């Protein structure tokens, strides 16, 4: 079975910027105003964020290739993954895999952005991306019925 997943760069960057904004706003209380301002990213930083998203997509391919075959491309502002799932794959997992890949990419972008300015906060986002990695591996392994 073939699973086709397309995720646009703009979706990933928009979500990452939004979450960075909310994180920055939550830190504006007290002495953390300077840090809060540093955390936030705008569309002006897309040239910095884009390579983080591309790196996340490549890392995702490496992960998927451990359990299934994947072809990956990036063009026209979209990441395209074509996954050849194992026999008897539960296709109900496909949208959940897409969601986990999206979360993984967003959290990796945020983690990379924060790694220089707030490594202690970046660690949280790298851990969240690792949770998505585990979820993807588990979902790719799901079958309609057990293989005997």
Model regions and ranges:
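Conserved short "hinge" loops at termini or chain/domain junctions
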Residues: 1-89, 128, 134-148
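Short conserved catalytic/interaction loops centered on acidic-Pro-aromatic/His motifs
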Residues: 118-127
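Amphipathic protein-protein interaction modules
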Residues: 73-115
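Short, charged/polar micro-motifs that form catalytic or ligand-binding hotspots
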Residues: 39-46, 50, 91-100, 115, ...
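Short, well-structured alpha-helical interface segments that form or flank functional binding sites
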Residues: 47, 51, 55, 100, ...
């Amino acid at each position: 079975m073939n699973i086709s997943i397309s995720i646009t760069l703009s979706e990933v960057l928009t979500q990452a910027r939004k979450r960075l904004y909310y994180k920055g706003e939550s830190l504006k209380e007290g002495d953390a105003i300077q840090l809060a301002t540093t955390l936030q990213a705008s569309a002006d930083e897309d040239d910095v964020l884009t390579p983080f998203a591309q790196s996340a997509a490549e890392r995702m391919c490496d992960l998927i290739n451990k359990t299934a075959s994947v072809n990956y491309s990036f063009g026209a502002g979209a990441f395209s993954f074509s996954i050849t799932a194992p026999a008897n794959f539960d296709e109900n997992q496909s949208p959940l895999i897409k969601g986990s890949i999206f979360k993984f990419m967003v959290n990796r972008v945020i983690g990379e952005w924060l790694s220089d300015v707030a490594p202690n906060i970046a660690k949280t986002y790298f851990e969240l991306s690792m949770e998505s990695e585990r979820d993807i591996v588990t979902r790719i392994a799901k079958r309609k019925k057990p293989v005997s």
